[in-house]
Amino acid sequence: MNLKKLLTSAVLSISLCQSAFAAPVEIDKVIGIVNQGVILKSEVDTIVNRVKKQAEEQSQELPKDETLRVQAVERLVNQTLMMQMAERMGLEISDSQLDQTLASMAKEQGGSIADLRRTIEGSGESFQAYREEIRKEITTQQVMRANVDRRVYVSEQEVDNLLKIMESQGQNAEEYDIGHILIDIPSDASADEIASAKTRADKVIELLNDEQEFKRIAISSSSGSQALEGGQLGWMGINEMPSLFAEAVKGKKQGAIIGPLRSGAGFHIIKVQDVRGRQVVETTETRSRHILIKPSIILSEEKARSMLAGFVKDLRADKADFAKLAKEYSEDPGSALKGGEYDWADPTSYVPAFRDTLLSLKQNEISEPFRSQFGWHIVQLLDTRVADKTEQAKRNRAHGMLFNRKFKEESFNWQQEMREQAHVEIFPIDE
């Protein structure tokens, strides 16, 4: 018996049991199967309602609900695949780690978690559901980082070449606010399928040239990861964009429609929504130290977390020395011999779980145990400073630009490969 029949039988059995008492009422409905998991109609409705509410607040025109539901289903398929990957990796986001992330989010808005709760509940959304959605977002980010990072390599020669380009650009470098629409093509597409996709891409450009609203067209037509956000990629410099985009965007004026640009993923359409001079932003660097414990067959998740919790208790009571504990117990070979210490670095270079925890700390404060894709950590913030403009800082920035460019390209390839290897069935949603 396949999964769809099994689910149908289960729903039918419940209905028959209830029929002796009252007419059955449909509480929810399975609208998709992703490997051994399911997508529920209620999950689709939640995303659609959130997009519609945001559009209403911004006075933005949206396509029909049917189109929004298709995009919501696509997002849930990708999210489900990554959550399944997280389960296979043994990756879980603890409540304490989630609370630290929520505290950082609330702090950015000038408030506390209690203030954030009031805002969420004031919008008509359950705070518990919001917490779980953030937990999923953190999880999928860490899954992607763990799987895509190892596919990205930046050579010293590439860094040298980019530094020369940046030097020649001087202060004249520009940043572009980019909108993006992807008309995707399957990896094994036939000539007819490619021609059909090209025709659709040309039609989209035609609509945009007629000054149709970009976000609405992106939501209704794009297969890109930001489709439900209206295809908004945000501000980026030429050196931060995927190579295909950079060559086409350079020198374009505000309002320019570019494309279709062909890649292995499909046909890309870009709109230059605005142009500005590069914003010089001073970044804050941190110096920190940490201890990493990796769960294993011998050491369970709970024992690893409990072990670090004991370290934290002793450290706060001045009964232990951080450097000695790191040298003896930490399983991060790069820092253990140095007493767990990380030299000055931009915290955004760390994985999200580590970054968010570090940024939530005060100087010399030690965190509670938290989980990343590498294992369980505790971290202490030793000091902060405004990044200097040394040659090494420039080199680090160039490396970061190249890494981010390649990461964006590879993350799409990885998601496409994962989707093609999965068993996905989508059923009609009857309204």
Swiss-Prot record:
Residues 1-22 form the signal peptide. One of its GO terms (molecular function) is peptidyl-prolyl cis-trans isomerase activity. It is found in: Periplasm. Residues 173-274, 283-383 form the PpiC domain. InterPro entries: OMP_Chaperone_SurA, PPIase_dom_sf, PPIase_PpiC, PPIase_SurA, SurA_N, Trigger_fact/SurA_dom_sf. Transmembrane segments: none annotated. It catalyses: [protein]-peptidylproline (omega=180) = [protein]-peptidylproline (omega=0). GO terms for cellular component: outer membrane-bounded periplasmic space. Its EC number is 5.2.1.8. Pfam families: Rotamase, Rotamase_3, SurA_N. GO terms for biological process: Gram-negative-bacterium-type cell outer membrane assembly; protein folding; protein stabilization. Its main location: periplasm. Keywords: Chaperone, Isomerase, Periplasm, Repeat, Rotamase, Signal. Chaperone involved in the correct folding and assembly of outer membrane proteins. Recognizes specific patterns of aromatic residues and the orientation of their side chains, which are found more frequently in integral outer membrane proteins. May act in both early periplasmic and late outer membrane-associated steps of protein maturation. The PPIase activity resides only in the second parvulin domain. The N-terminal region and the C-terminal tail are necessary and sufficient for the chaperone activity of SurA. The PPIase activity is dispensable for SurA to function as a chaperone. The N-terminal region and the C-terminal tail are also required for porin recognition. This is Chaperone SurA. It comes from Pseudoalteromonas translucida (strain TAC 125). The gene is surA.
